[in-house]
């Protein structure tokens, strides 16, 4: 029985793919005079910024994070886009008594800003950001915290995401997992984490939950 659906935010509920790509490109060029390929950048989607930048220059992590966040904030409202039918999907889940949470690696201020900009923040019963937990995706702690806040066991939760980090976090917590095929990552990359289920588009989450609860 699925009593709660937990979502990653960027690339799952909100289309921030262009925003993230432009923010990384600007940061790498400005700070390190590097121009990584779009494929190289995309492969990092879903990882915490600190981990990503550490692999490029461990002595300038904070500078790079600050640079990234500055340009991300400047571009944010123009570059955030909706995925089709996300609002309808969330509204329908709520109407069926399903609890809804977000589990994101994005800091709370920008995560909430994006969710409010898209008009979907009102649907969330819990909103887990990196400030709330000691460990982060792919560790299961953020998913466990969301389940605790919602009063459900991990086995009663479905974690939905566009990156292996989302899927592994769900698995490590003992939740069921669902990958979204509209991910910006190569599908085989997402597949390496072996999601229990896949959906082609957000509305299919409704059919999946209904199937699991039948």
Curated annotation (Swiss-Prot):
Entry cofactors: Mg(2+)
What reaction(s) does this enzyme catalyze?
diphosphate + H2O = 2 phosphate + H(+)
UniProt keyword list: Hydrolase, Magnesium
What positions constitute the catalytic site? 8 (nucleophile)
Query: Per the UniProt record, which EC number(s) apply here?
Result: 3.6.1.1
Q: Which GO terms describe its molecular function?
A: inorganic diphosphate phosphatase activity; magnesium ion binding; phosphoglycolate phosphatase activity
Q: Which InterPro entries match?
A: HAD-like_hydrolase_sf (IPR050155), HAD-like_sf (IPR036412), HAD-SF_hydro_IA (IPR006439), HAD_2 (IPR041492), HAD_sf (IPR023214), PGP-like_dom2 (IPR023198), Pyrophosphatase_Ppax (IPR023733)
For this chain's UniProt record, which GO biological process terms are given?
DNA repair
Q: Superkingdom of this entry's organism?
A: Bacteria
Which GO terms of the cellular component aspect does the record hold? cytosol
Cysteine-cysteine disulfides: none
Q: Which CDD domains match?
A: HAD_PPase
Q: Which PANTHER family match?
A: PHOSPHOGLYCOLATE PHOSPHATASE, PYROPHOSPHATASE PPAX
Q: Which family does it belong to?
A: Belongs to the HAD-like hydrolase superfamily. PpaX family.
Indicate what this protein is called per its UniProt record. Putative pyrophosphatase PpaX
């Amino acid at each position: 029985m699925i009593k709660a659906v937990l979502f990653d935010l960027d690339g799952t509920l909100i289309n921030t793919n262009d925003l993230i790509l432009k923010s990384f490109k600007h940061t790498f060029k400005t700070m390190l005079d590097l121009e990584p390929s779009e494929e190289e950048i995309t492969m990092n989607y879903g990882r915490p910024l600190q981990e990503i930048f550490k692999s490029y220059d461990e002595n300038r992590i904070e500078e790079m994070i600050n640079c990234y966040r500055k340009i991300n904030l400047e571009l944010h409202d123009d570059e955030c886009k909706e995925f089709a039918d996300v609002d309808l999907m969330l509204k329908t889940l709520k109407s069926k008594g399903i609890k809804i949470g977000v589990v994101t690696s994005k800091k709370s201020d920008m995560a909430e800003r994006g969710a409010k900009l898209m008009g979907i923040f009102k649907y969330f019963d819990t909103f887990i950001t990196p400030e709330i937990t000691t460990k982060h995706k792919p560790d299961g702690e953020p998913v466990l915290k969301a389940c605790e806040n919602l009063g459900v066991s991990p086995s009663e939760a479905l974690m939905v995401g566009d990156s292996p980090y989302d899927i592994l976090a769900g698995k490590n917590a003992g939740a069921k997992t669902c990958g979204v095929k509209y991910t910006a990552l190569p599908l085989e990359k997402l597949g390496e984490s072996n999601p229990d289920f896949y959906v082609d588009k957000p509305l299919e989450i409704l059919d999946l939950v209904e199937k699991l609860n039948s």
